[in-house]
Swiss-Prot record:
<keyword id="KW-0805">Transcription regulation</keyword>
<keyword id="KW-0539">Nucleus</keyword>
<keyword id="KW-0238">DNA-binding</keyword>
<dbReference type="InterPro" id="IPR044810">
    <property type="entry name" value="WRKY_plant"/>
</dbReference>
<comment type="function">
    <text>Transcription factor. Interacts specifically with the W box (5'-(T)TGAC[CT]-3'), a frequently occurring elicitor-responsive cis-acting element.</text>
</comment>
<protein>
    <recommendedName>
        <fullName>Probable WRKY transcription factor 56</fullName>
    </recommendedName>
</protein>
<comment type="similarity">
    <text>Belongs to the WRKY group II-c family.</text>
</comment>
<feature type="region of interest" description="Disordered">
    <location>
        <begin position="70"/>
        <end position="93"/>
    </location>
</feature>
<dbReference type="InterPro" id="IPR036576">
    <property type="entry name" value="WRKY_dom_sf"/>
</dbReference>
<dbReference type="GO" id="GO:0003700">
    <property type="term" value="F:DNA-binding transcription factor activity"/>
</dbReference>
<keyword id="KW-0804">Transcription</keyword>
<feature type="region of interest" description="Disordered">
    <location>
        <begin position="1"/>
        <end position="20"/>
    </location>
</feature>
<feature type="compositionally biased region" description="Polar residues">
    <location>
        <begin position="1"/>
        <end position="10"/>
    </location>
</feature>
<dbReference type="GO" id="GO:0043565">
    <property type="term" value="F:sequence-specific DNA binding"/>
</dbReference>
<dbReference type="Pfam" id="PF03106">
    <property type="entry name" value="WRKY"/>
</dbReference>
<dbReference type="GO" id="GO:0005634">
    <property type="term" value="C:nucleus"/>
</dbReference>
<feature type="DNA-binding region" description="WRKY">
    <location>
        <begin position="108"/>
        <end position="173"/>
    </location>
</feature>
Length: 195
């Protein structure tokens, strides 16, 4: 697709139980998402509002959503939508925090990208109008209930869409694996210097 920088991962933020980023936007819309959206800050549960407190998006997202520019109509701003507010408050007594979803679009030949965490595949589903199935994974850390979905786009099979649901409550395991040889070496050197 011309005019789209495919080198940067694209980001979609959604929140809620039944929000599925694959069903809400078609493939053309997903490919046209602004690659320059900036994500920064802590990803934490929001206690009092529907908007996740830890998300900070650049002013480009506001222009993108607000209708300014040629792509303004692709993502609707649901903050003033009464249905969104009803769904947000629905079940508030039952469940205090909504699962947060983050979707990354990446060009890759591999379906599963190494993100530093360990995952266990627990399912696979064929997707309507797509020759590539969607795979479902869970984080293997015993107290973490983060899930991810991995799927290729129907119109561009080189693009892998990885959707994370939830927030990890533990450090990145690959980081610890990388640091452990260094820590062992430091312990060995400290023992040698004590002699």
């Amino acid at each position: 697709m011309e005019g789209v920088d495919n080198t940067n991962p694209m980001l979609t933020l959604e929140e809620g139980e039944n929000n599925n980023p694959f069903s809400s936007l078609d493939d053309k819309t997903l490919m046209m998402m602004a690659p320059s959206l900036i994500f920064s800050g802590d990803v934490g549960p929001s206690s009092s509002s529907c908007t996740p407190a830890g998300y900070h998006l650049s002013a480009q997202l506001e222009n993108f959503r607000g209708g300014g520019g040629e792509m303004g109509g692709l993502v609707s701003n649901n903050s003033n939508n009464s249905d969104h507010n009803k769904n947000c408050n629905k079940g508030k007594g039952k469940r205090t925090l909504a699962m947060q979803r983050i979707a990354f679009h990446t060009r890759s030949d591999d379906d599963v990208l190494d993100d530093g965490y360990r995952w266990r595949k627990y399912g696979q589903k064929s997707v309507k109008n797509n020759a590539h199935p969607r795979s479902y994974y869970r984080c293997t850390y015993h107290t973490c209930n983060v899930k991810k979905q991995v799927q290729r786009l129907a119109k561009d099979p080189n693009v892998v869409v990885t959707t994370y649901e939830g927030v990890h409550n533990h450090p990145c395991e690959k980081l610890m694996e990388t640091l452990s040889p260094l820590l062992r070496q430091l312990q060995f050197l400290s023992r040698v210097s004590d002699l």
